[in-house]
């Protein structure tokens, strides 16, 4: 009986090893995360916004260039523009081999996903967001139901309200920056900021939609590689001009004007 168990275990291990080997051989050791890209920047942004409406995180992530971005990314240009190397930067190490390329792709995905995650949290919690507390955190009393009461705040219906999103439309950066995007040193600054992406073309586009009695805004950087468009970042030169906080980099949604929402 023991011999049979050992034989079965060995066979299972061999099947698993062969399966893994075949999977890596087929993809040259890489998993490819990005989709086929989009014909226009509007199509790319619509995919992102519709993913939010559908409460489909993977659909939102499918709007981005992951591998293509890292294949063209110029870290030297980025560091020369910033003038510093900081451990908060993502990505921050060169893709000198397949291992580092894969590491950078995954770090990039984590970073953008975390920005979306943070904006969703801020949207759901509103004034109860820990970032709005003086301490920057929420503390719980022992021997109380503070934790339960806090967790219930995530079931307030805000997330589900996003499924009411309608009338997706697009604005130029100038339409929400009082034309600041296209005047003075800003056009050249935009070119410098986006040069690190190594894209054939980079644009900022503002997505707007109605969510019940509220308005949603997002303002990503979108790039063209060849004839395909992708998001490369949820943040942008536009969001920098209007002063979007770290809470709302991926999107902001609420009543009132954009200026009111990001204040």
Name these PLM-found stretches:
Residues 1-3:
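N-terminal secretory signal peptides that target proteins for export/translocation
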Residues 86-183:
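Low-complexity, serine/threonine/proline-enriched polar segments
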Residues 26, 124, 261-262:
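Short, aromatic- and cysteine-enriched interfacial helices/patches
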